[in-house]
């Protein structure tokens, strides 16, 4: 096979890979995509590579302080790079590409600590090893520059959302239901802008609270399953309003944006502390209540910041949970919002591709030396070029 790298209209144009392993820590999603100035992204292939239980356990253990962290982090980073490389080779195979055909690989890494209030965020990955294993330029560590500029370092996807999901006619909200929920508010008048931003001065967004991080943890504890398949465990239960009120009594939910969160706060220890006094509840009722918590916190933030919203488009793992989507629609209606709930597939982008596409796009922005953050979202001092390059 010979290289088919295109000569394109912008120096940064070409094929990029994007890899995303989220807070579920079950594996890595990857996409191969072609970016050309003024055109929508063209997905060439996608892949998913799972993580072994040993790696997943190691990553979960690194979420909290513990012994010998430097050694454990380094070994986990090497193991992650190996799995990321497998995903890249699968993308090369299915897209019929050679490494030289790929301009760069944008990789998020695995968040193990996110503490912007202390001036750091840690996405685990051995980017040098990944470049060695793939022979592709690797662009990594996207969040640190935003944090260095005084921002939250998250969410970073709103700039990409504005690029592909904006509308000239209606205010839209893009809601990512990953381990943590976050929203991007796209006021009417933006519209997709090809490779550029869609009116960054009006784009807003922030993390809302826990989503699959707690939902998955509870179902794994009681059913030994990695996630609530189709929301069926929650559907068997009934929301306990007293427990829901206790869960909602969390200072983060009252905090003003910009704000971001993660497993540093919303983890099994947080949940167990909240469940004190509720041991009598059936596990399925707790699951139903955790699902309602996610819906309520997202709906509260949309009602507070995007009352004119007419459409909510969901991506992330939660997009495959119809019980959660129904709960979100109900919660929005209860707050007086006439907003339809659908997945991003309705806008032409499968929900499982959105975040990996975003990090491919951030790599594209890096090569163009163009900013990748939205400072009104993260609170950074201004827009910045995000990422660090590890050449092939």
Swiss-Prot record:
Pathway: Amino-sugar metabolism; 1,6-anhydro-N-acetylmuramate degradation; Cell wall biogenesis; peptidoglycan recycling. The keyword Transferase applies. One of its GO terms (molecular function) is ATP binding. GO terms for biological process: 1,6-anhydro-N-acetyl-beta-muramic acid catabolic process; amino sugar metabolic process; peptidoglycan turnover. Its EC number is 2.7.1.170. Keywords: ATP-binding, Carbohydrate metabolism, Kinase, Nucleotide-binding, Transferase. Disulfide bonds: none annotated. Coiled coil: none annotated. It holds the Pfam family AnmK. The keyword Cell cycle does not apply. It catalyses: 1,6-anhydro-N-acetyl-beta-muramate + ATP + H2O = N-acetyl-D-muramate 6-phosphate + ADP + H(+). ATP binds at residues 22-29. InterPro entries: Anhydro_N_Ac-Mur_kinase, ATPase_NBD. Catalyzes the specific phosphorylation of 1,6-anhydro-N-acetylmuramic acid (anhMurNAc) with the simultaneous cleavage of the 1,6-anhydro ring, generating MurNAc-6-P. Is required for the utilization of anhMurNAc either imported from the medium or derived from its own cell wall murein, and thus plays a role in cell wall recycling. Belongs to the anhydro-N-acetylmuramic acid kinase family. This is Anhydro-N-acetylmuramic acid kinase. It comes from Burkholderia mallei (strain NCTC 10229). The gene is anmK.
